[in-house]
């Protein structure tokens, strides 16, 4: 996600602006760091919100089931996406086997369940050795278990130092997952060359004065896209095709102002494959709304429903990203940075440093900040994947980040 840096704007020591007589805390919920109102009981929260953790001394106002989107719909088959619903029982879950070609430079596995939670455990190489352990060297990839819960897309290699995973000469791999569902499904996508082009489907959700018919000519939209192009082109990646769609009727009225983070799941579920071919399906769904008014996540600018998101399959809770058009007319360049940031998440990039400085991305050539609340003084503050929008130019990108962008299955 991207948030305004409250500390840079004069917030309290936690980086949050608390209402008079109330306290707030910065928390990571569903993979997103944001400010939440503290509480001791449900009555401390506004209508429609509960005190999560009431009685523990560390409660916060949120929605019941905040991290529990509904089970994904079954993906449409065909067009190069082959869904398999066969697996082997192992202790604590299931083992999914699949073949990867010797020529592949990257692959994605997307396990999902209609009945239970799904979380990756280990990836076994063709020789039986552990190529990725999601409790240790690949722990950064478990974020989707908290965001999506019932679907867990994983991409390999997730950073340059993990190239050996795809340098095995091809063969049969096994992804072990934790789940109580005895019949989970999955699909596998792989590519034999690096990609350089990204296709996007931009859904306009009540954005003032902009429709699918005039979006391509809108000055703010052009500046926004040019900013993203400028960032990504430094690593040989560009935007190829942009398709525009209007979200209309009751859906527009329901989602144009997002007041509940959970609504983002329903919003991206409105996406549809732009065409029947795999090339058309391998596109990024972007939902541009009027704005966020989430009291418990003040300053939120954008949110990706997955890191990485669900590749190639549309119409589900992990099929896109949402960001605000609030600054499109006044700061289209900053909106473009937000777009580049959220697309980066959807393609598999993490924040250079997470809030509080306790975690960082796995990419070895991105700087790390001991406390991102320091804002502009952080060594990674100018990187486009810094967790806060600081209101200045944040267009830096590293070679390691470019490595990930070129290998994602959504870059063709």
Q: Model regions: which residues?
A:
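The catalytic-center signature of Zn2+-dependent metalloproteases
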Residues: 252, 326-403
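Acidic glycine-/aspartate-rich tracts in secreted/extracellular proteins
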Residues: 6, 40-41, 207-209, 291-294, ...
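Extended extracellular/luminal ectodomain segments enriched in beta-structured repeat modules
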Residues: 100-108
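Secreted, cysteine-rich disulfide-bonded mini-domains of extracellular proteins
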Residues: 1-77
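Active-site-proximal segment of zinc-dependent metalloprotease catalytic domains
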Residues: 268-354
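Stable alpha-helical elements in mature extracytoplasmic
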Residues: 217-227, 335-339, 401, 405
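Non-catalytic extracellular/lumenal accessory regions of secreted precursors
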Residues: 63-98
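Propeptide-to-catalytic entry region of secreted or membrane-anchored zinc metalloproteases
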Residues: 78, 86, 113-115, 124-283, ...
């Amino acid at each position: 996600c991207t948030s305004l840096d409250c500390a840079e704007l004069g917030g309290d020591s936690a980086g949050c602006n608390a209402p008079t007589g109330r306290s707030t805390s910065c928390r990571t919920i569903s993979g997103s760091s944001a400010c939440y109102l503290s509480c001791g009981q449900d009555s401390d929260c506004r209508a429609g919100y509960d005190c999560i953790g009431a009685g523990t001394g560390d409660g916060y106002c949120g929605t019941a089931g905040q991290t529990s989107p509904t089970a994904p719909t079954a993906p449409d088959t065909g067009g190069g996406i082959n869904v398999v619903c066969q697996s082997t029982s192992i202790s604590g879950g299931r083992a999914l086997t699949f073949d990867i070609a010797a020529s592949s430079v990257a692959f994605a596995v997307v396990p999902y369940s209609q009945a239970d939670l799904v979380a990756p455990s280990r990836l076994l190489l063709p020789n039986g050795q552990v190529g990725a352990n999601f409790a240790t060297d690949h722990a950064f990839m478990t974020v989707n278990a908290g965001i999506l819960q019932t679907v867990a897309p994983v991409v390999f290699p997730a950073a340059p130092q993990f190239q050996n995973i795809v340098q095995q000469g091809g063969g049969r791999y096994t992804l072990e997952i934790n789940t109580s569902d005895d019949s989970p499904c999955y699909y596998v996508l792989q590519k034999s060359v690096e990609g350089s082009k990204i296709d996007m489907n931009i859904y306009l959700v009540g954005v003032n004065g902009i429709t699918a018919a005039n979006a391509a000519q809108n000055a703010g939209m052009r500046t926004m896209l040019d900013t993203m192009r400028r960032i990504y082109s430094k690593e040989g990646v560009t935007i190829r095709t942009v398709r525009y769609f209007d979200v209309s009727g009751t859906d527009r009225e329901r989602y144009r102002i997002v007041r509940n983070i959970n609504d983002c799941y329903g919003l991206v579920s409105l996406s549809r494959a732009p065409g029947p071919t795999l090339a058309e399906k391998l596109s990024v769904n972007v939902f541009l709304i009027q704005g966020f008014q989430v009291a418990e996540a003040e300053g939120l600018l954008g949110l990706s429903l997955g890191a990485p998101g669900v590749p190639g399959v549309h119409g589900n809770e992990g099929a896109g990203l949402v960001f605000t058009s609030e600054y499109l007319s006044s700061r289209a360049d900053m909106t473009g940075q937000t777009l580049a940031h959220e697309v980066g998440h959807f393609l598999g990039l993490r924040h250079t440093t997470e809030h509080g400085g306790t975690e960082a991305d796995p990419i070895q050539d991105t700087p790390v900040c001991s406390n991102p609340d320091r804002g502009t003084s952080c060594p990674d503050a100018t990187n486009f994947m810094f967790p806060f929008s600081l209101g200045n130019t944040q267009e830096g990108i590293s070679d390691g980040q470019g490595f990930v962008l070129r290998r994602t299955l959504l870059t063709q």
